[in-house]
């Protein structure tokens, strides 16, 4: 099963997002795709508006990709484009924030927890209990939501 990480950022925070991205890229389990989903509203010139260190990550790591959307989905930008991009595939999607770093075994331990609860389709993995802060979703759950996400946005 694929492991995908969806992350987003905006112009006021993009300068520090490389620290977060590096912590995801250096996990004990290699992620199949780390997708930085951005919007043209915040980055009208695409990659030209991004810090050099973030663009360099895309060149260095074959599993790190930068995508630009015409519409700003706000918090949903870290998930909706990735769900659409991988429609029909079997995967686990982590939606992570751009303003923190993750322990090196964060994804590995989260996957173990998800495997322990095979019937669980969505899991909050935040340390402070705030629902939705860091989420892990199975594709079977997201596929059910996709028509609503498509119509909503």
Q: Model regions: which residues?
A:
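Short, acidic, metal-binding catalytic loop of nucleotide-sugar glycosyltransferases
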Residues: 21-32, 40-43
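Residues at the starts of beta-strands that form the adenosine-phosphate
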Residues: 2, 32-33, 92
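A conserved hydrophobic helix/loop-capping motif in glycosyltransferases and polysaccharide synthases
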Residues: 4-12, 27
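Short beta-strand-to-loop acidic/aromatic patch adjacent to the donor-nucleotide binding site
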Residues: 89-99
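Conserved nucleotide-sugar donor-binding
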Residues: 131-148
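Active-site-proximal specificity loops/subdomain of glycosyltransferases
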Residues: 37-90
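Conserved donor-nucleotide/metal-binding helix-loop-beta segment in metal-dependent transferases, i.e.
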Residues: 104-127
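A short, conserved alpha-helix in the catalytic core of glycosyltransferases
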Residues: 152-153
């Amino acid at each position: 099963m694929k492991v995908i990480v969806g992350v987003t950022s905006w112009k006021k925070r993009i300068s520090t997002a490389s620290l977060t991205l590096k912590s995801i890229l250096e996990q004990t389990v290699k992620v199949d795709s780390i997708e930085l989903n951005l919007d043209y509203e915040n980055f009208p010139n695409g990659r030209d508006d991004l810090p050099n260190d973030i663009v360099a990550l895309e060149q260095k790591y074959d599993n790190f990709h930068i995508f630009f959307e015409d519409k700003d989905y706000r918090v949903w930008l870290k998930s909706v484009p990735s769900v659409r991009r991988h429609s029909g595939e079997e995967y686990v999607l982590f939606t992570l924030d751009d303003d923190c770093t993750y322990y090196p075994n964060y994804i590995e331990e989260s996957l173990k927890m998800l495997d322990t609860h095979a019937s669980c389709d969505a899991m909050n993995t935040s340390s402070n209990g705030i629902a939705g802060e860091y989420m892990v979703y199975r594709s079977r759950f997201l596929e059910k939501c996709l028509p609503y996400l498509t119509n909503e946005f």
